[in-house]
From Swiss-Prot:
Pathway: Quinol/quinone metabolism; 1,4-dihydroxy-2-naphthoate biosynthesis; 1,4-dihydroxy-2-naphthoate from chorismate: step 2/7; Quinol/quinone metabolism; menaquinone biosynthesis. The gene is menD. Belongs to the TPP enzyme family. MenD subfamily. Catalyzes the thiamine diphosphate-dependent decarboxylation of 2-oxoglutarate and the subsequent addition of the resulting succinic semialdehyde-thiamine pyrophosphate anion to isochorismate to yield 2-succinyl-5-enolpyruvyl-6-hydroxy-3-cyclohexene-1-carboxylate (SEPHCHC). One of its GO terms (molecular function) is thiamine pyrophosphate binding. SUPFAM superfamilies: DHS-like NAD/FAD-binding domain, Thiamin diphosphate-binding fold (THDP-binding). It holds the Pfam family TPP_enzyme_C. One of its GO terms (biological process) is menaquinone biosynthetic process. Its cofactor is Mg(2+); Mn(2+); thiamine diphosphate. InterPro entries: DHS-like_NAD/FAD-binding_dom, MenaQ_synth_MenD, MenD_middle, THDP-binding, Thiamin_PyroP_enz_TPP-bd_dom, TPP_enzyme_TPP-bd. This is 2-succinyl-5-enolpyruvyl-6-hydroxy-3-cyclohexene-1-carboxylate synthase. Homodimer.
Amino acid sequence: MNHNEALTKQVYTFASELYAYGVREVVISPGSRSTPLAIAFEAHPNIKTWIHPDERSAAFFALGLIKGSERPVAILCTSGTAAANYTPAIAESQISRIPLIVLTSDRPHELRSVGAPQAINQVNMFANYVNFQFDMPVADGTDYMLDAIYYQMQIASQYLYGPHRGPIHFNLPFREPLTPNLERQEWLTSYSKKLPHYQKNINVQDIRHILKEKKGLIIVGDMQHQAIDQILTYATVHDIPILADPLSQLRKYNHPNVITTYDLYYRAGLDIDVDFVIRVGKPVISKKLNQWLKRTNAYQILVQNNDKIDVFPTPPSISYEISANDFFRNLIEEAAVDRKDWINMWRTLESQARNTIDKHMTNATDEAAFVKILIDKLTKDDAIFVSNSMPVRDIDNLLYNSEVEVYANRGANGIDGVVSTAIGMAVHKKITLIIGDLAFYHDMNGLLMAKINNINLNIVLLNNDGGGIFSYLPQKASAEAYFERLFGTPTGLNFEYTALLYDFTFKRFNTVADFTQEKLSHVNSHIYEMVTNRDDNMSQHQILYKKLSGILNVTL
């Protein structure tokens, strides 16, 4: 077998194996060394390829595709520093447990560490962030070449689904000439492999004595597409309140046991004795709730469908590596405990908080008011992708009486790659992105994918000309003389020109009243800019916190 035949056999087999394990989309950043595999993916009849010239943005775009499709997605780049640009998205996928398949093309071994162009050490370059990594052999036409693909792909597949999900990395060295034989299409196959079903049982006896106590809470974070119906069933039967993070997707059911305003109450000073807490999924957004979890004496049970448990904000009393549905299904027959007073207290607090927020918002003019109006405009067919920093916190406080789904990059919690991830999700869902001006600036080039692929989404841009969240930190008062330059960081950018560059329609709103009258359109892509003031945002949030504190003084 000559070099061309060996190369063709290798890359066509590799592409076919990825398909067999569920890959249906690949994001390719153009380059020379990645030619063999890029052509293999493009030639495969059932793999959709996306082309993005910026590797950093491409990787975040792939994260969005994974979030929207619930399937693993591969990214492919050329050799050299191109691969290093994947790092932020890989870090995010590792902490968020997203099955991102990283494919870095490389120089063959004889061209490494000898000064050859576009050759850096790519072996183990993502070692701190991936669950699996392998440096593939150069195509040589032997059976061992194919065995390496079959064996290593099978090992890697355990990280594509189930409790061990996360990023994997294949480094693929290619020798020139790089063009495979386009005539050998029969080597591209489209069969699928069955993956093992994962389930574990729990020993209810370990926690039965705890579950007999009256004052229990269920706290649910990001569930990452897990089934959640058994959580609601258990909470209903046993009268236990559910403190549901917006990323849990539990809020859309408007269940009477689902509590959404807990962050505002803990911020206002809520401190109730609790006997046990069942923590499910990823850690929640709410800083105040996490602080309470750290100081409470309650018995804490952690349930996560992953072997790498997130103990933040504090190690649990006991943990279970099991899906939420399997866990609560095991508990459903436990003897009932009279918790009517307990659940009714939480329902009363929730009702009073919602009424207070609704009344407050009738006269509010800050960013939160824009966010609340947006939530009320969206329907069950819509999904929100929300940026980190202040937008995700406003969503946490204001998302109730709404059937929308909410998504965010809450692994590393960075503000980079937000636009690209949202656009990736918009391929599969009707997305509205809520983002601040600094996060938008960080990833403006991600808009290119929407432009060249006709991907429609709405962007609600909260423009306070700087880093609004820093106004809530001690630096605002303790370092006032340096605050604006070091933390406020105003840019003075006119984003209308960004919209023009990437073929988005643009509309600016200076008042909440104007936005209230606006009808959102999902025909084409739009940027709706909300001009706000950081000091005004800060003061109006403080007013709302005080109103919630007043409720606690009367109710408890």
